[in-house]
Amino acid sequence: MNAKQREQYWIKVERLRSQLDAKYIALFANAIDKDMKRFIVMLKKNGPEATRSMMGTYVWNEEMFTIMQKLYKEAAILFGNASYRAVGVMSRKAGNPFGLNLDWINEMLTFLTKFGLQLVANMTNTTKMKIDTIISLGIAEGLSSDEIAKMIMEDEELGYAKMRATRIARTEVMRASNYAAYVGASKHEFLVDKIWIATRDSRTRRIPKQSYDHWDMDGQIKAFDEQFTSVDKLGRPVVADIPGDPKSPKGFTINCRCTVGFIPKRDANGRLILKR
């Protein structure tokens, strides 16, 4: 893929992602709002000290995980099909994805079983740490439960459920879309390479302004089973199977807009290289 083709591919993927963004922003915002109200009720009922102790047993938000399951199932069909068909067009060997939807969903749920609980736990822990800091400050200042609750609700980061939901939803739609595309591309009988596709604009991660780089990763090609490679601001290696890889640093993946494309592998005579 040349730069123009990558740009066109990214635009098509982003249009598909936008179909999911608004829906899941609303669902995540509702779950976050319920979470905040749960903490406030706990605080007013039990007091600051007891609430801090009780928060330690709250590991992750079950509703958030249910939303994640729904998102990943939907992404499996939408992006699995899109990727499968796109690779088929590029290979000039059209494939029929009939019967593969269930396979894609099962692989997505396996992925979510492996990484989803930790992803949701990380989201929950971020909220807990921020609330714990505010409660500690309130205790030190001798504030009442109502006053501490007011501080929590007025906190810029915690108070805007939609802002936090937007960050979570867009990150998870990106992650799910890329893994679904990865699964879809794997179902052909021939080998494919993968290519990192980043949109290059003022928001694209770029060193030294940001700690990680996606700008120079644009166009990087790897064999299907190899990892994309980069370095952070300090020169430390960063690897990823796909954009949004949950094994990569959070700062490398959160709010990422990159996508992954696939290119059929051909031999010296231009023939598709079949899997063995």
Question: Residues of each region from the PLM?
Answer:
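N-terminal leader/targeting and assembly helices and adjacent pre-domain segments
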Residues: 1-159, 262-276
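Acidic, glycine-rich two-metal-ion catalytic cores of nucleic acid-processing enzymes
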Residues: 160-276
